Amino acid sequence: MLSVTNALAVLPALVAAFAADRPTPEDPEALLQQIRGRTTAHLAQLPNYTCHEVIDRLLRRRGAWNRLDTVEVEVAFVGQQELFARPGEERFEERRIDRVVPHGTIGNGAFGAHIGAVFSQDVAGFKYAGTGKKDGHRTVRYDFSVPLEKSRFLVRHAANEVIVPYEGSVWVDANTLDLVRVDLHVKHIPSHIGVRGIEESMHYKVMRIGGAEFLLPRKSELGATDDTGAYSLNLVELRNCREFKADSIVKYGTSSEGSATRESPQQ
């Protein structure tokens, strides 16, 4: 089983206009600092909330796609941690996602941890990569990389696990500086883990929670290639997001930045 883990980030939508002297792509470092500050400030404003998460899992071998299954879990975002429960359970606990979904490729962090980790001070290195269009928005792009010594990205396959470096790209709306999309790639995985590479994309959209609008990673894709060349793809979507109620029972433990777990695919 392949499991991927990283950090939590969901962003409130823009509610005020920017000043006329907002940094522009001609000053990419100043613009990056404004994006970073905006992202981290919004994280602090995010209420605790819970969503129904639907995961369609597919497998490709020798060019042919096979739909494996659809997995549904309840996920709560509380204090910038992801807590999981099976549908129908009344109790959220801080437990690894592969304890809730014990078979196949699974991950957490897409709806929180990754962006929080990337925009933490002194974790990722950024490089301005120009302007363009992405997912219907006029965007500014930055590429980033997180070295091994600063990474908390955990890859777990069968009985093996390892922390790995990763890299990727961030696209923000050129007018609002709201996140549009985040892609990340894991390429340098030790051979004994049994996974050649991992890639993930997160797509952001404004959603209403508790009477206010927030920018959430409404859907994501998680792909992984194992040492046999089999490619697993998870299509993940958040539904029915709502404010987390205090009468839910929550157990806290040690937080993690994000992870991926992958078991050898079953057909």
Predicted region positions:
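Bacterial N-terminal signal peptides that target proteins for export
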Residues: 1-9
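Hydrophobic h-region of N-terminal signal peptides that target proteins for export
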Residues: 10-21
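Structured extracytoplasmic
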Residues: 20-167, 174-181, 185-201, 205-267
